[in-house]
UniProtKB/Swiss-Prot annotation:
Belongs to the CHAPS family. It is found in: Golgi apparatus, trans-Golgi network membrane. Component of the CHS5/6 complex composed of the 4 CHAPS proteins BCH1, BCH2, BUD7, and CHS6 as well as at least CHS5 and GTP-bound ARF1. The complex interacts with the cargo protein CHS3. Present with 1180 molecules/cell in log phase SD medium. This is Chitin biosynthesis protein CHS6. PROSITE patterns: TPR_REGION. Member of the CHS5-ARF1P-binding proteins (CHAPS) which mediates export of specific cargo proteins, including chitin synthase CHS3. Disruption phenotype: Abolishes CHS3 localization to the bud neck and plasma membrane, with increased protein localization to the trans-Golgi cisternae. One of its GO terms (biological process) is chitin biosynthetic process. The keyword Membrane applies. The keyword Translocase does not apply. Keywords: Golgi apparatus, Membrane, Protein transport, Transport. Residues 1-25 are annotated as: Disordered.
Length: 746
C-alpha cells in the first residue's frame, strides 16, 4: 500500500442546526444511566484454574504491594462468581475486573451484583445457588472491602485490614468515603493509562448519575476534600522522585476529571476557596490545587497568577526560618518548587525567558531532586540559545524510573497467571480451556452457540459482549477479534499483537529494533528526547553533536583515551579537565536520537515505497518522535487504511486534541477525518468494555465546541459505519456533554 499523503478534503454539505439540547432525539433520552444495566449484563468471564484462586492471589498481591512500600493505587476491583456443577459435584469460579462502581456504601455494589445475578441464564447442570463477591481496595487505610452476595439474596460486608491481616473491623462512614475516593481515583487513572489495564476489565462511567451536574459536583467535592491526604495516594514514580502536593494520583485524577467537565472549573475553584476557610490548617493543599487546575486548563491565566502570587509570597518569606533536616520543611520546599515550576512554565509561554530562568534556578535550589525544576531550567537555556548550559542541566537531572514499581508488581502477577492469549491477528488458536472447563463456562452462558463462544475466548477469558453497546460490524466482527484488547505495557505499538510473520516481513531490521518494548523511551526519556529535538530543530544534528563534544567526556571516549590523556609533564590537559562526564543514560539517548533521525531521513527519501500496515505505523511513530508532523500523520493514516490500527488512531487523535506547540500552522487533520477515527475508537473501546472513555469525551467536547453539537451529530450520522448500537453510546456521551454545557453558574 502506498503512503496516504494528505490532500485537501472536500467538505460535505453541513446540515444546518442550532444548539443541541438533551432530549432532542429519541435515542438521546436514554442517557448513560439506562446503559448501565446493559453494561452489567455484558461482562467478560475469566475461568479460574482452581476454585477461589483469584481471591487468594489478590490477598498475596496486596501483601506484596504493602511490603514493597509502594501500594500505589492498589489492585483493581474484581467480581468473583461461585458456581456448583451439580453433575460433577464440583465448585468452579469465574471473575472479571471492574472500575467505576460507586462505593460510598454497600448499596450500589449490591445493586450491581443483583443485576449481574438476575441476568444469568444458566443450564440445568449448574446450581442456582450462585454466590458473588465484589472486592474494592481502600488505599488510604489499606483495607480490602469485600461484599458477598449470597444465593438467598442477602449480603454481608467484610473489611480486611491488610496491615494486621484481621477481619473484625466495622465499616464506618469515614472508611466508606475513603473507599469511594480510592475507587474514583483508580477508575480515572486506569482509564487514562492503557498500560495499567488487564484484559477482562469492565470500565463503568463512574461520573454518571440521575443528574449529571450533581454527580460530577459530588466527585469534585470528594476529591477536593481528600487533598490533605493526597500524599497517601501514591504517585507515578516515572514522573517524580517522590510524592508531592502536585505529583500524586489524587491531583492527576482531579486534573483529568476537570478536563471533561470544563464548565465546572468555577465551581471547583469556589469549593476549594470555601475549604481554605473551613480548614485553614490545610489551606496550602487547596490553594495548590487551585493553581494546578487553572494552569492545566490554560484559560484563566490572570486568576492563576493572582492565586499563585498570594500563595508563594508568604511561603518564600518562611524559607530562612524552616528547620533543617525536617520532613515538614522538605515537603514545604517541594511544594514551593512545584509552584515555581508552574510560574516558570507561564513565563516561558509568555516569552519572558530571562525572568523564567531566575525563577527556575530558585526552584532547582529548593528541590535538587525535582525533575521538573531541572527540566524547566534546560528549557530556559534552550530558549536563550545557551545550548551547552541546557545540556549541563539535562545531565544533572535525577534519573527517573522507566517503569513504575507499582505497575511492575501488578503486571508481573498478571503475566505469571497466564490467563490471556493474544490472537495475533487471527493467526493462532487462542482458545485455551479443557473440555470440562468449557462445559462449565457454557453452562453459565446458556444461549451461546459453541463455535461462536469459542471464537470469543482468549486463553481463559471469554470476551463476550452480547448487548453490543457501541457495535459496528467493521470493528467488532473483524479487527477487534483479530487483535484483541490493546492494553498493558506492550500497547505502545502492534508488534506484539500481529502475526510473527508480519513482523518478520519487515525488511528494515532497524525499524523493528527502534520500536521494541525494550527501546521504548518511557516518560522521563521522552521528555529529555523532546529537549534534544528542540535543539536539533534550531541548530541541526551536527550542531548538537559539536556542542556535546565540547561539553562532555563520553564514557567510551574516557576509557579509550585514559592511557593517553596525561601530557608529558604528567598533567591532564585543561581541555579535558573542563569537560564533564556524560551520564550513561544521556549517552544512550543521543544514540537513540541519531538512529531515529537516520531512519526518518531514509524513509523520507523513499516515499513511494510500499509497506505493510505495521511498517507504516512504526514509521509514523518514529516521525512523531523526530517532529516530522506532516509525514507522521501521513504514515499513521496509511496504517489505518491498510487495517484499522488502534495505536495509530490514538496517536492521530492526540495530535488533534493537543497539537504540538512547535507544529506549523497547517491543518493536518480535518474534522471529518477526526470524526471517522473517533467513531472507530469509541466502537473498539466499547467492544472490550471501556464505557468510561475519558479521552474520547475530551475529543467529543472539542468537536462540539468547534462545530456545534447539532452539526457534529449530523456528521456522525452520515458516516457509513453508523448503526443504532454505536449511536446509543455516542448519543449518551453527547447528552452528558450537553448537560454540562447547560450548567447554570452555582
Amino acid at each position: 500500500m502506498n503512503l496516504f499523503w494528505p490532500s485537501e478534503t472536500k467538505k460535505q454539505n453541513e446540515i444546518p442546526g442550532g444548539d443541541y439540547t438533551p432530549g432532542n432525539s429519541p435515542s438521546v433520552q436514554k442517557g448513560y444511566q439506562f446503559l448501565n444495566r446493559d453494561i452489567f449484563k455484558s461482562c467478560p468471564r475469566i475461568m479460574e484454574r482452581q476454585f477461589g484462586e483469584c481471591l487468594h492471589n489478590r490477598t498475596h498481591l496486596i501483601k506484596d504491594l504493602i511490603s514493597s512500600g509502594n501500594v500505589g493505587l492498589g489492585p483493581i476491583e474484581i467480581v468473583h462468581m461461585s458456581y456448583l456443577n451439580k453433575h460433577e459435584k464440583e465448585e468452579f469460579g469465574e471473575y472479571f475486573y471492574v472500575t467505576g462502581i460507586e462505593v460510598s456504601g454497600p448499596a450500589m455494589p449490591v445493586e450491581f451484583l443483583e443485576v449481574l445475578k438476575s441476568s444469568k441464564r444458566i443450564s440445568k447442570n449448574i446450581s442456582n445457588n450462585i454466590i458473588l463477591t465484589y472486592c474494592c481496595f481502600n488505599f488510604f487505610s489499606n483495607l480490602d472491602i469485600r461484599i458477598r452476595y449470597d444465593a438467598d439474596d442477602t449480603f454481608q460486608t467484610t473489611a480486611i485490614d491488610c496491615n494486621k491481616e484481621t477481619t473484625d473491623l466495622t465499616m464506618t462512614e469515614k472508611m466508606w468515603e475513603e473507599t469511594f475516593a480510592s475507587s474514583v481515583i483508580r477508575a480515572i487513572i486506569t482509564n487514562t493509562n492503557p498500560e495499567l489495564k488487564p484484559p477482562g476489565l469492565v470500565e463503568c462511567p463512574f461520573y454518571v448519575g440521575k443528574d449529571t451536574i450533581s454527580s460530577c459536583k459530588k466527585i469534585i467535592e470528594l476529591l477536593c476534600r481528600f487533598l490533605p491526604r493526597s500524599l497517601n495516594c501514591g504517585w507515578d514514580s516515572t514522573k517524580s522522585m517522590q510524592a508531592t502536593i502536585v505529583n500524586n494520583y489524587l491531583m492527576y485524577s482531579l486534573k483529568s476529571f476537570i478536563a471533561i467537565t470544563p464548565s465546572l472549573v468555577d465551581f471547583t475553584i469556589d469549593y476549594l476557596k470555601g475549604l481554605t476557610k473551613k480548614d485553614p490548617i490545610h489551606d496550602i493543599y487547596y490553594k495548590t490545587a487551585m493553581i494546578t487546575i487553572l494552569d492545566h486548563i490554560e484559560t484563566k491565566e490572570l486568576d492563576m497568577i493572582t492565586i499563585l502570587n498570594e500563595t508563594l509570597d508568604p511561603l518564600l518569606s518562611l524559607l530562612n526560618d524552616l528547620p533543617p533536616r525536617d520532613a515538614d520543611s522538605a515537603r514545604l520546599m517541594n511544594c514551593m518548587s512545584d509552584l515555581l515550576n508552574i510560574q516558570t512554565n507561564f513565563l516561558l509561554n509568555r516569552g519572558d525567558y530571562e525572568l523564567a530562568l531566575g525563577v527556575s534556578n530558585t526552584s532547582t535550589e529548593l528541590a535538587l531532586d525535582s525533575f521538573e525544576s531541572w527540566y524547566n531550567l534546560a528549557r530556559c537555556h534552550i530558549k536563550k540559545e545557551e545550548y551547552e548550559k541546557a545540556l549541563f542541566a539535562i545531565n544533572s537531572m535525577p534519573r527517573l524510573r522507566k517503569n513504575d514499581g507499582h505497575l511492575e508488581t501488578m503486571y508481573s502477577r498478571f503475566l505469571t497467571s497466564n490467563y490471556y492469549k493474544k490472537p495475533l491477528n487471527g493467526t493462532r488458536e487462542h482458545y485455551d480451556l479443557t473440555a470440562m472447563e468449557f462445559t462449565n463456562l457454557s453452562g453459565t452462558l446458556r444461549n451461546w452457540k459453541e463455535d461462536e463462544l469459542k471464537r470469543q475466548i482468549f486463553g481463559r477469558i471469554a470476551m463476550i459482549n452480547e448487548k453490543k453497546i457501541g457495535y459496528t460490524k467493521e470493528i467488532w466482527d473483524d479487527i477487534a477479534i483479530k487483535l484483541g484488547p490493546i492494553c498493558g505495557p506492550q500497547s505502545v505499538n502492534l508488534i506484539n499483537y500481529v502475526s510473527p510473520q508480519e513482523v518478520k516481513n519487515i525488511k528494515n531490521i532497524n525499524l523493528i529494533a527502534r520500536n521494541t518494548i525494550g527501546k521504548q523511551l518511557g516518560w522521563f526519556s521522552g521528555k529529555i528526547y523532546g529537549l534534544l529535538m528542540e535543539i536539533v530543530n534550531k541548530i541541526g544534528w551536527n550542531g548538537l553533536l559539536n556542542i556535546r563534544t565540547e561539553a562532555f567526556m563520553m564514557e567510551t571516549e574516557f576509557y579509550q583515551a585514559s592511557n593517553n590523556i596525561i601530557d608529558e609533564n604528567g598533567h591532564i590537559p585543561m581541555e579535558s579537565r573542563k569537560k564533564r562526564f556524560c551520564e550513561g543514560w544521556l549517552d544512550d539517548l543521543f544514540l537513540d536520537l541519531y538512529q531515529d533521525l537516520k531512519l526518518s531521513k531514509i524513509s523520507l527519501s523513499n516515499k513511494d515505497e510500499k509497506h505493510s500496515g505495521l511498517e507504516w505505523e512504526l514509521l509514523g511513530l518514529i516521525m512523531l518522535r523526530t517532529w516530522h508532523w506532516e509525514d507522521a500523520v501521513a504514515c499513521l493514516r496509511t496504517s489505518i487504511v491498510a487495517r484499522f490500527d488502534p495505536v495509530s488512531c490514538q496517536q492521530l487523535l492526540k495530535i488533534y486534541l493537543q497539537p504540538p506547540k512547535n507544529i506549523q500552522e497547517v491543518t493536518l487533520l480535518d474534522t471529518d477525518t477526526i470524526i471517522s477515527l473517533l467513531i472507530k475508537k469509541i466502537s473498539y473501546d466499547c467492544r472490550y468494555y471501556n464505557y468510561c472513555q475519558i479521552f474520547n469525551l475530551q475529543l467529543l467536547e472539542k468537536l462540539c465546541n468547534e462545530l456545534g453539537t447539532h452539526i457534529l451529530r449530523n456528521k456522525i450520522l452520515l458516516q457509513p459505519s453508523i448503526g443504532d448500537e454505536i449511536m446509543v453510546m455516542i448519543d449518551a456521551m453527547l447528552a452528558w456533554i450537553a448537560d454540562l454545557d447547560h450548567t447554570v453558574q452555582p
